[in-house]
A protein has these predicted regions:
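Membrane-embedded transmembrane alpha-helical bundles that form the catalytic cores
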Residues: 2-451, 455-500
């Protein structure tokens, strides 16, 4: 005899431990919030037991990654074992050439993993275009979530040890903890070993009132950005425009591009906010990953504000390794272009990502040339007159949006069609009708940009207000935010955009 209630519980438990590619465990899901509450309760019992805490967090982190990528969580374990051993070999090696070969081995293993899973079919497609369809057969290769992030994070560890900037860990579990720590595992920020590792064995774990309040604030703002702004405008406006641009006027196509600029910012910075906030609740500090990038008055400033952990990684481990700005002006421009081309390729195996990287690389090189030949040219808006800064923000934002058009479009034909509609079929007379027809989406787009462009002191004031509020009030605010999310969310899970990278 079976009991329906028992069957229901069994089904839910099976779903809890089964991998489902269509239902990854993401920060904005009710399941994650429920699991994290339970995790946090047990975690607090280990605040004075470093080893038990490390094992407990690793177990939850691997479970978290398993729910996103299935059996490929073993790839993460392999990467941790490989670079842990290689790093110790680098540190112990007596000869410079031995150290060099070992760091090359680390880079080869990491890029080999990344290349196989991410770029095999891209290279097969290029080969078929060059030598005829059917020259090579496409492979059914699964792309593990966030592989680009943990590969870069692991490479930075071995490179820092090779450069003599870091000593290797003696305990493999500490390194596995660093590489698999679930808040930043699948979409960053890319955390440097020298910043994070000293925090692992803190005893006891200290979560101050300021850390707890700031963590709550960041989780709530991240949830708002992702589930209310990004997901809503994506499903109800942006996706429709990019799917069938010829069905829409040039104004709608332009607003679709602007909407995507806000969508990807709210999606990615929302994840980063939640990751940083969750880490704070666990007693860890992550670096800031976004700093109001659409306030940038130059493309150089944009890359100091957008995905800061990636841009600094590319600067420290690629641009400087290529020679940086130490080899003359022409070499500097070439290094910038190559760095951003590879940065574009890091985002995905498609021509559109390479073109996106090329656009940004060329823009950075031209801006550096501009500063070299024009007296008084500035690198950031803070150094400009207000009118020059306003013009710079307008120009930089639209240049970045041109890049987002390439980044989002499924093909270059979509790029051409949307630009054609904007320049030849703008149809300004339809603007009032379009705005009223998409009132909800346009209201959220306007609100999102207004909040983004507010002075930094307003954001800091709101953060202090929430972080210093009584615990009961913080709980009420969290419950209210979750209720709002439930009212506007789609029935389908909307993964974070950067999960695919």
């Amino acid at each position: 005899m079976t009991f329906p209630a028992t069957d229901g519980i069994t089904d839910r438990l099976q779903a809890l431990f089964a991998y489902d590619a269509s239902s990854p465990l993401i920060f904005s899901s009710g399941l994650f919030l429920f699991l994290f509450a339970g995790f946090l309760l047990v975690y607090s019992a280990f605040r004075r037991a470093p080893m038990a805490r490390i094992v407990y967090v690793i177990a939850f982190s691997l479970y978290f990654y398993y729910k996103s990528s299935g059996i490929y969580f073993l790839l993460l374990v392999f990467a941790a074992a490989s670079d842990f051993l290689i790093a110790r070999g680098i540190y112990r090696a007596r000869f410079r050439w031995t150290k060099r070969w070992l760091v090359v081995l680390s880079v080869a293993v990491n890029l080999g993993m990344l290349g196989y899973f991410k770029y095999t079919n891209f290279l097969i497609d290029i080969s078929n275009q060059l030598f005829g369809q059917g020259f090579l057969q496409f492979q059914n290769i699964f792309l593990p979530v966030g592989i680009s992030f943990f590969v870069f994070q692991s490479m930075s560890y071995t490179i820092d040890i090779y450069r003599g900037q870091l000593k290797p860990l003696s305990n493999w579990l500490d390194y596995l903890f660093y590489l698999s720590f679930f808040p930043q595992l699948v979409a960053g920020p890319i955390v440097r070993a020298r910043d994070f590792i000293p925090q692992i064995r803190q005893n006891p774990v200290v979560v101050t009132r300021e850390m707890f309040g700031t963590g709550v604030f960041l989780i709530l703002t991240g949830l708002f950005k992702k589930a209310i702004i990004s997901d809503y405008i994506s499903l109800n406006f942006v996706d429709r425009i990019f799917d069938e641009p010829l069905l829409y006027s040039g104004f709608e196509c332009l607003m679709g591009i602007y909407g995507y600029a806000l969508q990807i910012y709210c999606d990615f910075s929302g994840y980063s906010d939640m990751a940083i906030g969750i880490a704070l609740l666990l007693g860890f500090r992550f670096p800031k990953n976004f700093d109001a990038p659409y306030k940038s008055a130059t493309i150089t400033e944009f890359w100091r504000r957008w995905h800061i952990s990636l841009s600094t990684w590319l600067r420290d481990y690629l641009y400087i390794s290529l020679g940086g700005n130490r080899k003359g002006r022409i070499r500097t421009y070439g290094n910038l272009l190559l760095t951003m081309l590879l940065g574009g390729l890091w985002h995905g195996a498609a021509v559109r990502f390479i073109l996106w990287g090329a656009l940004h690389g060329a823009a950075l090189a031209l801006h550096k040339l501009w500063m070299a030949v024009v007296p008084g040219a500035k690198a950031t808006g803070d150094q400009m007159h207000w009118w020059s800064r306003a013009a710079g923000i307008f120009f930089t934002f639209n240049l970045v949006c041109l890049g987002w058009l390439m980044f989002r479009a499924e093909s270059m034909q979509t790029v051409e069609l949307m630009l054609h509609q904007i320049f030849y079929n703008f149809n300004a007379a339809m603007i009032p009708q379009v705005v009223s027809g998409y009132a909800g989406a346009f209201a959220l787009i306007a609100a999102g940009f207004l909040l983004h462009l507010m002075p930094g002191r307003a954001d800091r004031f709101a953060q202090r207000l929430v972080s210093h509020a009584p615990l009961v009030l913080q709980i009420v605010m969290a419950a209210a935010m979750i209720w709002c999310v439930m009212q506007v969310k789609s029935s389908d899970i909307q993964p974070f955009i950067y999960f695919q990278f």
